[in-house]
């Protein structure tokens, strides 16, 4: 499983950018969730399961997508 960088800038496979604030743990199930904020429009905050955040794009559903990761960590050169 890919490591999540807190404070990292990520690009969603559809092209929009998000800032990862933290990784949180569900109090009952123990499941990990990524807490992140969109960097456009009203800058809403979201949570998504860690497993889904680090998953690859469904190439059958999105056959023309160029980015294989659902969310890709951006380096300073991207």
Write out the residue ranges for each language-model feature:
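Mixed-charge, low-complexity intrinsically disordered regions
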Residues: 1-78
